Amino acid sequence: MNPGFRNVLSASQADRRDLFVGAGNRLGTAEQNVEKDFWVSWTLDALFNSPVTEGPRLLFKGGTSLSKGYGLIERFSEDIDITVFREEIGQPASVEELEALSGKKRTARLESIRAACQEYINGTLLTQITAQLAETLSATGIPPEGRLEPDPNDQDHQSLLLWYPTVTAPGNDYIRRAIKIESGAKSALDPHSPNIVKPYVDDDLPELDLSVPNVTTVDPSRTFWDKVVILHGLRRWWDHRNELKGGGQRVSRHYYDVYRLLAAEAGQLAVENRDMARDCVRHAQMFFNRPAFDLSEAVPGSFTLAPHDGMVADLRRDYEAMSGMIFGEIPQIDNVLAAVATLEERLNATTNQEA
């Protein structure tokens, strides 16, 4: 692991607080976000570079990979989304192999994948990261206030919460003083490449290099289409149930992420990558499908990405709560949703034969 993190943690509480406050002022974000980002980066270092975390390969994905891995979104991303390589927990399974199975055999196989991932996350990984955290805190003279525990709200029992020791003042309730390591073994693995991530405070410490290398990160083109599938599912869920899935909590970020990606070359290239689109939808149908998502309709001609009018009020509330995580100028949600609607029109202007 990068010894620079220990150098920072060995400083006094006052010095660490000043570091986080100063970086927050420079970036236009809360000091609590900067502190949490520091621990997000430490956690990524522990997951991908710690000598004690031997085991199956991991893949970094989701919104945090867009911000930390590629700098494509200007949103503080507070949690870590990782996928365990299935074959390395004894569960090799491609979409093609699963499609060839009967319904009962397929269900049993998917359950086996889930159970194997649960065992690894709540056993080996929990033990390894707990040991690394304890060793880091002991070596830097910080009281053992941090801890790692299973997330009691995860019904799949595949997520962990890392409660880190804090030196900043309490912030708003939207930013929890814990990093959620959201895990699973069902996500697509390709394309990916090794990446380097850095905490925000790296720019404030020229005498240190806080780079975290070797972070195997999914390509942003897949993340873009994964987000598109999520938006389609959110809208279809509303159409079927007349409610915003999850009560609209922490979902506006998906609309923002798509908006930001569309403003980047990587996003525009992803829009044209219809092979990736089909692969993402096919994968989601196999591993994450719910009837109310209507993923069979997530094809050119029938994508539904723009929210129903009845969804917008809840999305506005969630977006306002989330806006403190955005650096610099905050895009108006009307502009965000308009861009999503334009994307829907663009995708549906192409027939299946032309896609």
Language-model features: locations:
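Glycine-rich beta-strand-to-loop/alpha-helix junction loops that act as flexible
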Residues: 60-64
